[in-house]
Amino acid sequence: MSENFAAFAYLVSGVLFIMALRGLSHPTTSRQGNLYGMIGMGIAILTTLLLARPSFGSLVLIVLGIALGGGAGAFIARRIAMTSMPQLVAGFHSLVGLAAVLVAAAALYAPHAFGIGEPGQIHGQALVEMSLGVAIGAITFTGSIIAFLKLDGRMSGKPIMLPMRHAVNAALLIGVVVLIGILVGTESHFIFWLIVVLSLLLGVLLIIPIGGADMPVVVSMLNSYSGWAAAGIGFTLGNLALIITGALVGSSGAILSYIMCKGMNRSFISVILGGFGGEQAAGQADDIDRTVKQGSAEDAAYLMANASKVIIVPGYGMAVAQAQHALRELADKLKANDVEVKYAIHPVAGRMPGHMNVLLAEANVPYDEVFELEDINSEFAQADVAYVIGANDVTNPAARDDPSSPIYGMPILDVDKAKTCLFVKRSLGSGYAGIDNTLFYKDGTMMLLGDAKKMTDDIVKAMDH
């Protein structure tokens, strides 16, 4: 295959990747988007094989690698629960980072195989690209592993605050930059692996002080890192498809991180610095009447059965309890009684971007019933019931009304404007921000304390009587 034709094929795969992103932007076109991505990746792999013209032995290894990787991917995809998607995404990001490190190491030890020079005489530009790719890849690898452990509950989701962490991180970052300069000048293998070690450590230290509920930003941020790592290695290899794909993933992840931060009214830097929710925050919650109106499943069933409009607000509590199917059953029961049902999604609800959308899609909730914050917030005032299931800080009126609150200014779902707010939660404990939710103590709120799935199931049963 000629290089010109290969460049054209890579360009076609890049266009397909762009179409895939566009398709994945809406649930109704997500399957089509996935198909575009699969075709684009197939073209990129086939083009690479035809361009490289590997020997029979190398081809066997390549096919074996594709079979093992594809088989493992298919196995995981079939067995993974939708509630574990955040962990899966973080795990995949770690593999992208690891791949960038391994490819960079291979290029360092066998530069002639990659067309970037000979041992001891690697092109300076290739060394810079390789160094950046391996540094970002190593940070992505360990950062994603920490994110996986936090999301999977194998590590505390609370911020882990080390003394002088900012100074240590800054020193490590400066050290990596200096070592990259030394590597470009000396091509030392020892310096290369020292960059890897420092970057691996930096990845851990950057993520451990970030609280579990900031994970939507972290996941999209690591997604961006993995893209830039791939793009860096793409430049080293002179692979157009890898450069295009890496740039697409890197830029889309960065944009998504910005959107997530905007949804929390926080700067990207404040999230990366971490520590949010590490201590009990103060606010007006100490001065308000703490009387709580607690209800039962039967009370909730009566209110919903006599409502004309119900807006359901899912949050992380729904994901933990795996209550999405029970929620769909409740919605079906309400619609059978001529009750209008809609779902309201906050952009940072859950532990990854689109977490609630994924869970509702698994339960076959119709797409046209699911609305984003800006599209449905004005409708709460006309709703008879807002059924909040484990969405704490994203419904806290203090973010709207209390200038002294740490979350003041964060866009929230105005569930308190509904005639009645039914709030399902295990306890009256604070959310990740460490502050009381003033919604609990409002006259129009009825607390339904207990497991989200069991409570929803009990409401459905009560509606049958």
Predicted regions and their residues:
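Cytoplasmic-side transmembrane-helix entry/capping segments in multi-pass membrane proteins
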Residues: 31-40, 62-64, 84-96, 159-170, ...
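Structural signature of hydrophobic alpha-helical transmembrane segments
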Residues: 1-14, 51-70, 126-141, 187-198
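C-terminal ends of transmembrane helices
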Residues: 16-29, 70-89, 144-159, 202-215, ...
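Transmembrane helix-loop junctions at the membrane interface of multipass transporters and ion channels
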Residues: 53, 106-120, 184-190, 217, ...
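Structured cytosolic domains appended to multi-pass membrane proteins
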Residues: 286-465
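Transmembrane alpha-helix boundary signature
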Residues: 48-63, 75-84, 101-119
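Mobile "lid/hinge" segments at catalytic clefts and subdomain interfaces of large enzymes
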Residues: 211, 225-257, 261-269
